Structure formats: structure tokens, C-alpha cells
Amino acid sequence: MTEPTQPQAAVAADENQIVAERRGKLRALRDQGIAYPNDFQPTHHAAGLQTEYADADKEALDAKALDVAVAGRMMLKRVMGKASFATVQDGSGQIQFFVTPADVGAETYDAFKKWDLGDIVAARGVLFRTNKGELSVKCTELRLLAKALRPLPDKFHGLADQETRYRQRYVDLIVTPETRATFRARTKAIASIRKFMSDADFMEVETPMLHPIPGGAAAKPFVTHHNALDMQMFLRIAPELYLKRLIVGGFERVFEINRNFRNEGVSPRHNPEFTMMEFYAAYTDYRWLMDFTERLIRQAAVDALGTATIRYQGRELDLAKPFHRLTITQAIQKYAPNYTDGQLSDDAFLRGELKRLGVDVTQPAFLNAGIGALQLALFEETAEAQLWEPTFIIDYPIEVSPLARESDTVAGITERFELFVTGREIANGFSELNDPEDQAARFRKQVEQKDAGDEEAMFFDADYIRALEYGMPPTGGCGIGIDRLVMLLTDSPTIRDVLLFPHLRRED
């Protein structure tokens, strides 16, 4: 482990000294028997007061003489002789406390002068406006509710280190308004989605997180062991097969918002634990799904941000416009127009081109890959990152879509789409395969690929086949990456910015 630099060591020493001093103050509070009281109830919140009385002048507030009780974290303190000020932040926003010994008493005022930034404080008093126009609480009672032992980051620089922001998200939330705004927008977006689904007669359900057989996606699972049953189990990579069992059971419209787990790499777009919404609707197909998904995402933006026009990484994006639709080869030729139809149908050319682009075509997934899989790989190298505006890529090859219904008109193609925005996949949906014999054959093909070394190939799920044998109506199903959608709505460049506690290496 590398030794800390001199500046780092100095900062650590200073912080240790501050913590020691604050612990001394806490000991004094314990001796007085008032260290951590729990008998204060706020009557108002900062943001509500700021909003309701934004236009009230000093005279109007004095005439109203509104009694308030407010609590929060002390973010700023100015001691000025016989009158002092504190900026206090609660869960909604900030408001100023005005403190004088005449109002709170000399003993409380002297104690207040020793309180530290970060302390949780509470006040009762009257709402008024200072001579400088600041809405404030003129405190008649002031209390310390919880002592902060660690100092907050410098108010001018905040948390400069990105990893520290992720590792100590609690501090990031205290000092970074933008972080708090991101997660409030996330909550609004998810609430919007739930309402949208409910209004469309979908039923929210919960399906298992521990699976005896991983399925529903091409991914490497986390493996665990169930001691009581003495059996190997897997954290779910997708809820798909369980949700479709519910369609078989007669619930014609279902959805689930929950976590998936995939034992794969970490990147700006990937976290091993992530949130997805999957939904399934009987008597629909992938065309219906595209229209529905487009409306859902547009509404989530409006409810979370107040508009369907957003800015992402400096570029404007209008989600109110109709989303584009392209096939895989159309997308390739749009962004790499030198490729001819003949080249895109030539196995040897595609393999050579992928190799030229740095793709290892000797991987197990490529050993028996057909034209469709090779075209998809070329699309990922040449076109995917260029799909800035919302674009449905449609008609995926059957060999990479083992759960999707085959097209009635084009052999080897499925009724499947993926939605890309700002070069990232946001959603994946298709007309569901409901033919049990076809599904069993595709599972067997996946097992062959797994035996050949493809760790992401699917297992054979005999119980799911049994469910299909009872008859599943024609169905459309879609999965939407909630984290990536929130990245888009909050102008966040990495998935870690929209996860409260993203996975990091252990802190040694």
C-alpha cells in the first residue's frame, strides 16, 4: 500500500485533532446528561417555509408572528457578539437561525458558540425577515440534538475526490445539492413509472431473487448456497421467466421493479447490482411495446423534470419527438455507409472486419456464430455509440434472441427491439416465444454453447417449458434499465452517480 503524501498526512492529522476536540465536547454533554435527546418534533420544514413566505415582506411576517419549530444540520455559523446566525439544512432545504442571548438566554447562547458545523440542532421561534431580507427563525429556544464528531468537507471545495463521494455517500448528500437533486429525480421517475403502469392496468408483482436455475438473460450469475435445502442457487440475472409464468397463470398484465445481479465487469454503464423494470402484456407484440415504452419514458421525463426536453452532457435531447426505428443493417450503413449489402452478408468479410476492429472472434460466443450474430457484433462496434437520439433497433437475429418469437415473414429474424439513447441501451423487448417445443430446442442450443465455453449462454429450464405447455397467450415483454434511464434524466455520465451506494473495491 502506498504511503500517504505529506499534504494527505497533514490533513489526516488535522482531522484527527478536530475529532479529538469534538469527542471532548461530547464527553461534556454526556456528563450533563444531554448528549442525544430525542424529544423534539419539527412543525415546519425549510423548503416549505421558503416557498410559502417567499413574497412576504418584513412587516407582513411581523404581523403574522408565525411560531415554528425547525431542526436540521448546521452548515454555517457566524458569531457576532450579541447576535449570531446559523444556516441550518433539513431534508428539504436550508433556512437561517437568528440567535441572541436576550432571546435564548446567556447559558444557551454560550453553549451555541461552542457548537460545530455538522451538528444537528433544533429551534423554536418566530419566522421573520432580517434587515437584509433573509427569511429566518428568530430563536426563542435552541437545542443541540446530535453532536457531529467528524468535520464536514471544506464548503468551497466540497468532496473533490470522486471515489470518496461514492464511498461516503452520506457526506456527499450532506454537502452536494446536485447529488440530492439526482436522487429525488430518480424517486420521481420511478413513481411516475409505477403510476403509468397502474393506469395501464398492469399489476405490480414480486418474483424470487434466488433462482435454482438462472435464466431470462445472457449473463454470468452470482452463485450461492441454500443451507437448509442443501442446494446451489443463483442471484437472479432477470425475472423474465417467472413473470411469464404469471402470464400463463392468467395475470395478463404484470410488471416488476427490482434488482438484478450479474457477476460481470464494472464500467460507466454497468454495476453488478442494478435496477430493472420488466413488464409483460398478453395479446400484444413488439410493435405495441415500442409505442408503449416510448410513451412511458416521455412521461417519466415530464414527471421527474417538468419537461420532455432534456440536456445530456451538453447536448439537447427532445424526448417528445417520435423515436427512430432502424434494423441492425440499416443502422450499420447509416453510420458506416461504406459497407455494402453483400459485405454485410459475407461471413468471412464480417469476421475479418471484426478482427480489424479489435474484436476477438476466437471467443466461444463466435465459434458457431451465424451472419446475424456477426452483424450484431459489427453494429456494436460501428453504430451503437452513434445512436444519440432515441432509436429502436429492430429485428434481431434468432441466434442471439433465444426467448423471442421468430418473424412470420423473415426466417432467422425475431420480433425484437432494443432502445438506444445517447449511445446506450435503455430497453430490450420482444414478442415472446410461446411455442414450448421451439423454446425447448432453443434452450438445448444454448446448453451446447455453454458446453463450448460460453459462460453467458442460458441453462435449460424444464419447469418453464412445462409452464409453456399449459399454454401462454401471445405476449409482449420488455425490460427497462432504471439506472440508465435515470442517468439520462439527470445528466449523469456514469451509473455510479445514480446509485446511492455503488460497488467499490474494499477500503484497506
Curated annotation (Swiss-Prot):
It is an enzyme of class 6 (ligase). Keywords: Aminoacyl-tRNA synthetase, ATP-binding, Cytoplasm, Ligase, Magnesium, Metal-binding, Nucleotide-binding, Protein biosynthesis. It catalyses: tRNA(Lys) + L-lysine + ATP = L-lysyl-tRNA(Lys) + AMP + diphosphate. Belongs to the class-II aminoacyl-tRNA synthetase family. This is Lysine--tRNA ligase. PANTHER family: LYSINE--TRNA LIGASE, CHLOROPLASTIC_MITOCHONDRIAL, LYSYL-TRNA SYNTHETASE. The keyword Nucleus does not apply. Mg(2+) 1 binds at residues 418, 425. It comes from Burkholderia pseudomallei (strain K96243). The keyword Protein biosynthesis applies.
